[in-house]
């Protein structure tokens, strides 16, 4: 078995990130329990690398992940596009109401 690597000139991307991308709600300096306004951020280890390489070095990056086709999924997609990362490899799945949202509280923040 041999590994065939194409030249860079034949590749669409410098990097494709594979992994989960999350939405983080940040209450700022206030406590999460009493906050009524939040700043929303996108994030996830693999995605952070793709966005960083795009912003710092101008590399062509994309993400391969799956999102529920609902308002939250589309909001995260918009954040990704604002970061200059390609979203054409996102798989959109219908939201059937059975998905679960996971929250972790740490020092007043939701991750």
Predicted segment positions?
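Alpha-helix C-terminal capping segments
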Residues: 48-60
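Short catalytic helix/loop segments, enriched in acidic residues and glycine
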Residues: 31-51
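Conserved N-terminal subdomain of the carbohydrate kinase-like
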Residues: 60-111
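Positively charged, low-complexity intrinsically disordered leader regions
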Residues: 1-37
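Short, conserved beta-strand segments within well-ordered enzyme catalytic domains
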Residues: 39, 54, 62-64
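Conserved active-site and cofactor/substrate-binding residues in soluble primary-metabolism enzymes
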Residues: 13-16, 44, 48, 71, ...
């Amino acid at each position: 078995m041999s590994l065939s690597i194409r030249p860079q000139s034949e590749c669409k991307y410098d990097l494709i990130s594979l992994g989960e991308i999350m939405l983080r709600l940040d209450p700022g300096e206030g406590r999460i329990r009493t906050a009524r306004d939040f700043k929303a951020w996108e994030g996830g280890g693999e995605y952070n690398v793709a966005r960083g390489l795009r912003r710092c070095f101008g590399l062509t990056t994309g993400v391969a992940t799956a999102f529920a086709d609902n308002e939250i999924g589309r909001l995260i997609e918009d954040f990704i596009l604002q970061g200059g990362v390609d979203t054409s490899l996102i798989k959109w799945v219908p939201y059937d109401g059975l998905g679960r949202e996971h929250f972790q509280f740490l020092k007043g923040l939701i991750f």
